[in-house]
């Protein structure tokens, strides 16, 4: 029975640190996911504008000829 009280003291002592570390890790992972998504969206939009520019050039070439 004496062993359980030690574990309760141990968990209650380190519980705030555990929750703090958990929150920090969660925030970091969310930030990483958000930055990756933003980078992907930027690449997609750049690709889209590039495609639009090439299409416009092709149309201009057809009009000129």
Curated annotation (Swiss-Prot):
Highest rank taxon of the organism: Viruses
GO cellular component terms, semicolon-separated: host cell endoplasmic reticulum membrane; host cell Golgi membrane; host cell plasma membrane; membrane; virion membrane
SS bonds (residue pairs): none
Membrane topology label: Single-pass type II membrane protein
Residue positions with a glycan: 52
UniProt keyword Transport, yes or no: yes
Record field: transmembrane: 21-44
Activity regulation statement: Channel activity is inhibited by copper. Also inhibited by small-molecule pyronin B.
Pfam families xrefs: SHP
UniProt PTM: Four species of SH have been detected in infected cell cytoplasm: a 7.5 kDa non-glycosylated form (SH0), a 13-15 kDa form that contains one or two N-linked carbohydrate side chains of the high-mannose type (SHg), a 21-30 kDa polylactosaminoglycan-modified form of the protein (SHp), and the isoform generated by alternative translational initiation. Of these different forms, SH0 is by far the most abundant protein detected during virus infection. Tyrosine phosphorylated.
Signal peptide bounds: none
Protein family according to the UniProt entry: Belongs to the orthopneumovirus small hydrophobic protein family.
Subunit field text: Homopentamer forming a funnel-like pore. Interacts with glycoprotein G; this interaction occurs on the surface of virion particles and infected cells. Interacts with host BCAP31 (via C-terminus); this interaction is direct.
Protein role: Viroporin that forms a homopentameric ion channel displaying low ion selectivity. May play a role in virus morphogenesis and pathogenicity at various stages of the viral life cycle. Accumulates at the membrane of the Golgi apparatus in infected cells and may facilitate virus release by modifying the secretory pathway. May enhance host membrane permeability and disrupt cellular ion homeostasis, which can be sensed as damage-associated molecular patterns/danger signals, triggering NLRP3 inflammasome activation and inflammatory immune response.
Protein name (record): Small hydrophobic protein
Gene coding for it: SH
